[in-house]
Amino acid sequence: MKEDVGRLLIQFKNENGEGLGTPFDVPVDITPDKLQLVCNALLQEEDPVPLAFFVQDLEIVTSLDKTLEKQSVETEKVIDIIYQPQAVFKVRAVTRCTSSLEGHTEAVISVAFSPTGKYLASGSGDTTVRFWDLSTETPHFTSKGHTHWVLSIAWSPDGKKLASGCKNSQIFIWDPSTGKQIGKPLTGHSKWITWLCWEPLHLNPESRYLASASKDCTIRIWDTVMGQCQKILTSHTQSVTAVKWGGDGLLYSSSQDRTIKAWRAQDGVLCRTLQGHAHWVNTMALSTDYVLRTGAFNPADASVNPQDMSGSLEVLKEKALKRYNEVRGQGPERLVSGSDDFTLFLWAPAEEKKPLQRMTGHQALINEVLFSPDTRIIASASFDKSIKLWDGKTGKFLTSLRGHVSAVYQIAWSADSRLLVSGSSDSTLKVWDSKTKKLLIDLPGHADEVYSVDWSPDGQRVASGGKDKCLRIWRK
């Protein structure tokens, strides 16, 4: 007869450290599947969700004893096992290019799916914005009006409007269902537009207000219904590189003056200046970006043919608020910033101006940084050819994803936070698995540098664009 396997005392805890039940003993070689059964029984949820289990930040992948072997944990004491709910749906990796869409006559600078994945828009150096029909994967509308490169595009969280900003400082609003311009151009900035961001749906379901950042050192808040500038935020002394509209009523701006500023959106009062970077701040992300982008749309409810969200403004607002609160959790929104000084900083800007963590390791400037939709992982893309993953709560370094042979320009997460796609100046896209931290699929196809990449919120498609003027759509 086989000898009894050793047993250990464990205590389940959630991500905030709150205990679930009392300590109890389990076989030392217990697997994640068995832990899942025990934990679900304790949680008593009507619809159990998949869980991941961790001992001191290390995930239990095969069995508890294998995980403990890699760590110095006192096994005589009660071992805390942290359980983390995972996405209930699974996004499958894209593996092939289903369409190569021609039409732009200059480089494609930006591509973006609407919040439900119904529409795809692109902005180009040829001064046009194009809308693409995703059911047929063909060009839909070419929207003309800009007289210079379109540098930035942004979907309103209700999916009914797209804003675009160009190199000669104008902002246009477009209707994706007709490709026609809505209202007059928004004019007032004196230099080019670097970034656009709409007010979150749960704060205003009309998607009325838009924030813009410019090389002229200012941020402007626009009433897109009246076609007027409401506020001009001045305090930065150099180009503003990005602006984010947080879910708790703060606006955040990053600048080449090395600072990040937090403003009260309501009245434009400057609340905080975050300092620490030694050079230009190029990019930033909020832990709640994904839920703010998708508003009332839950990727788990996606249908085969994506549709706009239906329902009254009140219903949509409630849905968006519920989703926002679930993602935001108990702490405040976190912000991560990336700089020309090769570093990233993690902040809780609503609460304090000291950074939570300085994140070092990149060997060249940082192009883009993004939180995973579940806020647990931060991914950063750099000119050093690598993508690095960091813990979304602490900023602790997790791993480097290597495979690109040239600068990585842009990255995008899948809605379930399990996959990441990257676009590079080496002309390829690559799909990475955030759990195994490995390259899943290499996607060659572009003839030149890939400037922009996006993953549709319903998980079905990836779109990419770049120097070869072609827009490519990738599917599973």
Swiss-Prot record:
Gene Ontology process terms (BP) = Notch signaling pathway; regulation of Notch signaling pathway; ribosomal large subunit assembly
Where is this gene product found?
Nucleus, Nucleolus
Signal sequence span is none
Which Pfam families does the record associate with it? Answer: NLE, WD40
Q: What is its main location?
A: nucleus
Q: Which GO terms describe its cellular component?
A: nucleolus
Q: Where is this region: Ubiquitin-like (UBL) domain?
A: 5-87
**Which keywords label this protein?**
Notch signaling pathway, Nucleus, Repeat, WD repeat
| Organism superkingdom | Eukaryota
Listed CDD domains: WD40
- Please list the residue ranges covered by the WD repeats: 103-142, 145-184, 189-234, 236-273, 311-357, 361-400, 403-442, 445-476
Keyword Nucleus (UniProt): yes
Entry function: Plays a role in regulating the expression of CDKN1A and several members of the Wnt pathway, probably via its effects on Notch activity. Required for normal embryogenesis. Plays a role in regulating Notch activity.
The UniProt entry's sequence similarity note says: Belongs to the NLE1/RSA4 family.
Q: How does it assemble?
A: Associates with the pre-60S ribosomal particle. Interacts (via WD repeats) with uL18. Interacts (via UBL domain) with MDN1 (via VWFA/MIDAS domain).
Matching PANTHER family: NOTCHLESS PROTEIN HOMOLOG 1, WD40 REPEAT PROTEIN
- The protein's name: Notchless protein homolog 1
What is this protein's gene name?
nle1
